[in-house]
């Protein structure tokens, strides 16, 4: 359980940092939610797995994994395509 929580935490932190480093206009150009909304979603995912992980348990880990997964699989590739960066 702890290994799963740590893996989701690392993934959520990576997604949060990646989202923070992107240009705000790239989100709207990719027709995705705005940058502040994604930062709130991914920040909540990080807090669900780190600070609140013991309160919410497996449910918090699953929610955080879904949020980070959606960003990394759907939003990140579109942002990189819009900005002309390679994956």
Curated annotation (Swiss-Prot):
Tell me where on the tree of life, at the top rank, the source sits.
Answer: Bacteria
- What name does the UniProt record give this protein? Uncharacterized protein ML2453
The keyword Transmembrane helix appears for this protein = yes
User: What are the record's GO terms for cellular component?
Assistant: membrane
Residue ranges of coiled coil: none
The record's family statement is: To M.tuberculosis Rv0476.
Compartments (UniProt record): Membrane
Record field: transmembrane: 51-71
């Amino acid at each position: 359980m702890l290994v799963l929580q740590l893996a989701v935490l690392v993934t959520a932190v990576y997604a949060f940092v990646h989202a923070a480093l992107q240009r705000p206009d790239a989100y709207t150009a990719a027709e995705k939610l705005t940058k502040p909304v994604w930062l709130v979603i991914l920040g909540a995912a990080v807090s669900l797995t780190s600070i609140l992980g013991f309160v919410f348990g497996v449910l918090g880990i699953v929610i955080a994994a879904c949020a980070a997964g959606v960003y990394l699989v759907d939003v990140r590739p579109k942002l990189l395509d819009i900005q002309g960066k390679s994956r």
